[in-house]
Amino acid sequence: MDDSWILEVKVTPKAKENKIVGFDGQALKVRVTEPPEKGKANDAVISLLAKALSLPKRDVTLIAGETSRKKKFLLPNRVQDIIFSLHIDV
């Protein structure tokens, strides 16, 4: 677990576009177009994070909040600096 990092994410499903919005305290805010049913929104968040961080989807693991808007993802530690340096249009 030393080579992993937990990222808190606040998700807005059924949005107009898939987008990383910015930070709300310690949590990264994201919007996804998929509805929160049958894991569709979770899969969309995983895809969005993987693309933004240039990671394979298998490196983005949902560890808490499967049915909640507040989620926790396990990511490789090497992306921590990338998360905080993302250019986010608010």
From Swiss-Prot:
Pfam families: DUF167 (PF02594). It comes from the Bacteria. One of its GO terms (cellular component) is cytoplasm. Belongs to the UPF0235 family. PANTHER family: UPF0235 PROTEIN C15ORF40. This is UPF0235 protein CPn_0497/CP_0257/CPj0497/CpB0517.
